[in-house]
């Protein structure tokens, strides 16, 4: 039985923080809420009488409230750590990695349901873990931010999909980012890992034989399917159910999602491609000539190698957001023509006006969205709206 302190500080007022505060309040805890931007000397008084700090994923460890709490011996938990303890140690399949987490989690949910299991998909996708209902199994998407402050969270099956540079603006170095990701294995029963990384566990790769071919397109999605297959088998799901899930799962929003086909031109929403590794996979998923919408907020990535890989496939790039200058410099060293569109609406209209039948207008921005949109979902929704309004 989890004993909670009388007073808890929740830092972050977005989705995870709101769910954590609601879960604590429902258990009679006096909840103090703080925006993640707080942290001057006056704000530190929020810690008075607090016995636990719960921080949302967007709150860095350098936040003054977090630093002061740790210095004072106050425990600091991530929202998923709180959710795990409130659910009394549920059976979790945890999924982390740089790219493919949401697709793999939702695919696992489909596979578990095909196998007749009671399953909830939660964490960084679906509902926050503190808002999830009790279930036989929980498939939990875990970001590096969420894994930074776990203490007892234990996965029956822990999956690492891939490891490529990302969130360096938050973690500082790739080593720090990798170390956060690998925390998923600290207390796991079964580890599922990519072949070739040199990690202990059940290995998977894109060329693994599968019970059925996945419905969703792209070589990267076959790799996601291989990871899901290995994880499902480790959880006791038979190949009949796995095959059913692979054949029927339609994919998820904002990941190589066909938004519209108009006069022979396909418009594809891959707004979730918030780093170059994800955008590289998006570009590689198609053989047709591409008109590629790139840009958004910067995350500390070097675009040079990514830009060089675009030349054979991309007919023209349309640059948006604060990353436009960096992307332009990278593209100047290649033969890829580009134009500075500034915003998504201008980019979509320009690409649509120039696109020829058989081409694809692809939003796969290789950047986060926060300079112009609340999140990648809002960016993808705006892309869909713009595309539907084309005539």
Which residues make up each language-model segment?
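Glycine-rich Rossmann-fold phosphate-binding loop(s) that bind the pyrophosphate
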Residues: 13-14
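Nucleotide phosphate-binding/pyrophosphate-handling subdomain across enzymes
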Residues: 2-8, 18-23, 27, 89, ...
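Short internal beta-strands
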Residues: 32-34, 192-195, 293-294, 313-323
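Conserved beta-strand positions in the Rossmann-like core of class I SAM-dependent methyltransferases
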Residues: 9, 32, 120, 318, ...
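Adenosine-cofactor binding site in Rossmann-like domains, unifying the SAM/SAH pocket
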Residues: 35-41, 209-213
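Phosphate-binding loop of NTP-binding sites
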Residues: 22-27, 38-50, 57-192, 199, ...
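Residue-level signal for inorganic ion chemistry
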Residues: 24, 53, 95, 124, ...
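C-terminal helical cap/extension that packs against the catalytic core
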Residues: 304-359
